[in-house]
């Protein structure tokens, strides 16, 4: 994978970011599900190169912008997108994508914000990724279908590796 987002949902997040960053220096490793400035600081100290949050927290966004840390806050309404626009952002996470109306909702929200690109997450999988990736306002997609917790728990890392390779190859095929 060229890029990985480690979620800050567990106590192992910081150490995971550190280990991945050291083992794979060519990989762009970031922290996701970041809810506070304190978590931003911990993630960056561990080696995170970008921050993603599930919602739009102006304090987190401002801290990241003030410290030159790439940040992608989550949005799912035009009001959220407007906040991002006013703060100078041009890429936003659309979350949760599928439960919030999917690609048709993104297209509706994106229409007045012609400068904005989106990274949808939440319900993206191998069956719907192509539709998202074909829309020119989608910068990237996020998904965890290739890293299911059941595979991690059972130690099926080769399967995870193969599923990840397949996903990356599919993105390259769709995007050219």
PLM regions with names:
Residues 1-2, 23-27, 44-51, 66-72, ...:
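Glycine-enriched alpha-helix->loop->beta-strand junction motifs that scaffold or abut catalytic
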Residues 1-24, 145-155:
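Glycine-rich, proline-tolerant flexible connector loops at the mouths of alpha/beta enzymes
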Residues 2-10, 27-35, 48-56, 70-77, ...:
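Catalytic beta/alpha-barrel core
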Residues 17, 40, 61, 81, ...:
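Generic hydrophobic/aromatic pocket-lining and core-packing "Φ" positions
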Residues 36-46, 79-87, 124-139:
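Catalytic cores of alpha/beta
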Residues 50, 54-60, 93-103, 137-159:
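Glycine-rich phosphate-binding active-site loops on the catalytic face of alpha/beta enzymes
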Residues 63-69, 150-176:
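C-terminal helical cap(s) of enzyme catalytic domains, especially alpha/beta-barrels
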Residues 78-92, 102-112:
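Anionic-ligand binding region
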